[in-house]
């Protein structure tokens, strides 16, 4: 049996590392960069901002690249090649050691998902309002030229506003972020084991920028969205009933689970 105390020790080590602190700083800055102009609109219009901007922001291809690139940075040292890690490898054996690494990846993916949403809310303080729906600000951005007028770095896709309730979109996005990050971490771990850590990082970087590439190609060839897991963290890239240009949520979940099994 793998002792829970050992797993928690490894997980605590990852969370308290300088690498993770740098990640938190970078993610916080990225959210501030993209969301801060909303506060300017809020101050001018007098409208509060609902706390559901996370799904809209993750559907922005440029933010998605930054978000996934920072996750690659976090996963780049799994497995850790240090002396302590090698000691645990010898002590636990290959199978148990591998299981511990996979559990760590899942925990990190969950923490990153929850932390990123929390940061997106904190960034908007004190302009947050307790609105259970999307609120006026996001509809204003979607239906007017406010995004260009106030130099916003992301749009408010009307496709999302019209097809999803705010909390539904949030839960769906967080679920997809968790699944995609877990797949990314497991894939990088597997590549580093069978090939090298350098190749795993290269794979991660290609994975991180793939939403930008797919966004350009999909205008003429929509089918490429079916083969880009990284693009699925933005629910504007996931189809709904009678929309066959994008993979459905069922297709997405099944594909990620299949990819993850193959990676493992």
Residue ranges and their predicted role:
Residues 1-26:
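Aromatic- and glycine-rich beta-strand/loop motifs that create alpha-glucan
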Residues 7-16, 95-106:
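Interfacial transmembrane-helix starts/ends
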Residues 20, 93-95, 196-202:
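Membrane-helix interface segments
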Residues 25-29, 198-212, 228:
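Central hydrophobic cores of alpha-helical transmembrane segments
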Residues 31-77, 99-193, 228-256:
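Secretory targeting signals
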Residues 72-90:
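Transmembrane helix boundary and interhelical loop/hinge segments in multi-pass membrane proteins
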Residues 210-237:
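Extended hydrophobic/aromatic segments used for targeting, binding, or gating
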Residues 262-264:
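Alpha-helical transmembrane segments
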């Amino acid at each position: 049996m793998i002792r829970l105390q050992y797993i928690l020790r490894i997980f605590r080590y990852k969370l308290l590392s300088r690498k993770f602190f740098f990640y938190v700083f970078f993610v916080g800055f990225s959210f501030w960069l993209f969301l801060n102009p909303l506060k300017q609109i809020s101050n001018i219009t007098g409208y509060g901002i609902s706390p559901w901007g996370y799904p809209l922001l993750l559907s922005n291809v440029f933010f998605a690249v930054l978000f996934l690139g920072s996750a690659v940075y976090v996963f780049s040292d799994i497995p850790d090649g240090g002396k302590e890690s090698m000691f645990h490898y010898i002590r636990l054996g290959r199978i148990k050691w591998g299981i511990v690494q996979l559990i760590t990846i899942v925990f990190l993916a969950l923490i990153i998902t929850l932390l990123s949403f929390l940061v997106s809310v904190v960034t908007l303080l004190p302009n947050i309002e307790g609105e259970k729906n999307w609120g006026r600000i996001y509809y204003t951005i979607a239906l007017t030229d406010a995004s260009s007028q106030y130099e916003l770095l992301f749009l408010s896709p009307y496709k999302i506003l019209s097809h999803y309730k705010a909390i539904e979109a949030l839960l769906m996005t967080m679920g997809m972020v968790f699944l995609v990050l877990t797949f990314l971490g497991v894939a990088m771990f597997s590549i580093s084991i069978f090939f090298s850590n350098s190749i795993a990082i290269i794979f991660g970087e290609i994975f991180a920028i793939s939403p930008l590439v797919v966004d350009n190609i999909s205008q003429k060839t929509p089918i490429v969205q079916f083969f880009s897991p990284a693009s699925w963290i933005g629910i504007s890239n996931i189809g709904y009933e009678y929309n066959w240009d994008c993979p459905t949520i069922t297709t997405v979940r099944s594909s990620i689970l299949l990819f993850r099994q193959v990676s493992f």
